[in-house]
Amino acid sequence: MLYNLSTSLIKKVYTAFVVPTEREDPVAVGFDMYPQLLFCCGLIFGDFIKCYFLTVKILNNRWERIVPFRDYRYLERQNLHYMLQQRKITLAESEIPTHWYNIMADMPNKPLPPLHPGTQQPIDAEALAPLFPMELIKQEVSTEKWVEIPDEVRNLYSIWRPTPMFRAIGLEKALGTQSKIYYKYEGVSPAGSHKPNTAIPQAYYNAKEGIKKIATETGAGQWGSALSFACQLFGIECEVFMVKVSYEGKPYRKIMMNTWGATVHASPSNLTNAGRSILEKDPNSPGSLGIAISEAVEIAATHDDTKYSLGSVLNHVLMHQTIIGLEAQKQMEKAGDYPDIIVAPFGGGSNFAGIAFPFLQDKLTGGKNVRAIAVEPTSCPKLTRGVFRYDFGDTVGMTPLIPMYTLGHNFIPSPIHAGGLRYHGAGAIVSQLLKDGIIEAVAINQTECFEAGIVFA
């Protein structure tokens, strides 16, 4: 399962682990409790980012605090030079879920409605129609618990789904823990990430309405790659605004998007009023997802044959990703286990929602005491340091106002390697769940993530 660090440039594995320990020293071998752990955090081998390893201190059978896991040299001291012994849990194609799960149906407090950027009144479907196909608008506001996956979408999912789950037995031994560690691996998709889970249905619904072109943004290139792949399947033209710092630092992502027929621009660009306004203020702007969103939205809003597509944040996007967790539930049942903790990286919410929401259904309706922890970068800590309020989803202020934890739509994060996590706000659903104390959030430094990724590799 583990790919060669020097050669695999796009494969992405979602993994992380939590170590319950009695001591400050993360190599402690005495434990008060051994919860089963299921995780879905990110690691790109050869270009790796988003891997979050945490140490949890237990006192009096309580999870007292979460601190970064720093002591990796103990692996050498214990002469544990293997990390590959794992147990694979698979599903048949016939077990691909037939419906997406909409957590809105089970939330005790529904998110506040999005507001029109001009009137600041609740926005209606007519105002969203220039940007999205009607079926996605319906999904965005729906409170129906189960939304059927179209047969054509499900058939395309079968190109790579169901994705495998692994029990990281070698990692457990390396840590000296009796906790069970599982991870769901989404890197088997053609684009190398979880993003095609929503790119495919978004392209499908646009194609059904006769849309000829989709404009979008991308950070590190994962979403742009996924949508390029999906648009190619449905004969739709794809135009991608890629955050400049990633455009320059990750040229292979641009090549991948071009291979699937997409046109890719560095953002901010001189192609839009939004881009030009940013460059006038800062000709050397590294760009941000908020800026790239502004440019893509402008293209969609000014061209009748073009719609806009977003790879995270919005309700329908998060719902499409729940296919990950729905499969994981079946795989955990096959393994005879159930997770106590779920961990996932957090940029706008799609990865986290995908693995966590189906298990949170058990918490909201079935009394399961599962914990879901969103892990974000310290350079863009919207969940841990942001303010809950209405804010724009883009930098210029063209999108509807969304109720979210936000650092402010003008916030430009540091140009960290994890380009897909450089977003100022969180989706409305995730923000409401955090506000209600149903989920948790922590922030981790980039260097610690790199070190932890090397240990896992």
Where are these regions (language model features)?
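Metallocofactor- and cofactor-centric catalytic cores in central/energy metabolism, strongly enriched
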Residues: 137, 146-182, 189, 201, ...
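Active-site/ligand-binding loops adjacent to catalytic centers
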Residues: 146-148, 278-280, 285-316, 324, ...
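Positively charged, low-complexity intrinsically disordered leader regions
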Residues: 86-210
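Active-site-proximal loop->helix
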Residues: 223-286, 382-392
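Alpha-helix C-terminal capping segments
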Residues: 201-211, 225-237, 258-259, 356-366
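Active-site nucleophile and cofactor-binding loops and adjacent substrate-binding regions
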Residues: 185-198, 214-224, 314-317, 343-348, ...
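A short, small-residue-rich loop immediately preceding and capping a beta-strand
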Residues: 198, 209-245, 338-351, 372
